[in-house]
């Protein structure tokens, strides 16, 4: 989910709009989610990701320049860069999956994953297990209370193989984890 305000501030992540998402009403226990607020040049990338999907089924050519703000000079960069990415309906590249493979194959200390829907192909299963067996701490946090029973059942079928391969799996018991988080080494 993407929300961009005047090209200056962007939000990405779990920004659902209903009482259950702010825990005013409980459908699946306590709802846990994440979102990130961005400012600066990274907001331009979020804007382009949003616009690429906007009216994707129409054949017209859109000029996006009117939605972009001028590049701002003088932003602090000593802490690093933020590069938003997304998969696209216009090609067969799985950008997100490739980023995850790169992280799992490159990290030295840990990879912590939080996801409500652990539905993985064999390549991802193998990569997760290989990372764990190489000494990287691989932790996956899943919901204990599902919102989609079929996705929950499918996810459970991977538990045994992952645990035997050294991956640690935990379930959030007070409610539902809707967050999609992939965190790796601090440096």
Residue ranges with predicted function:
Residues 1-187:
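Charged, low-complexity intrinsically disordered terminal segments
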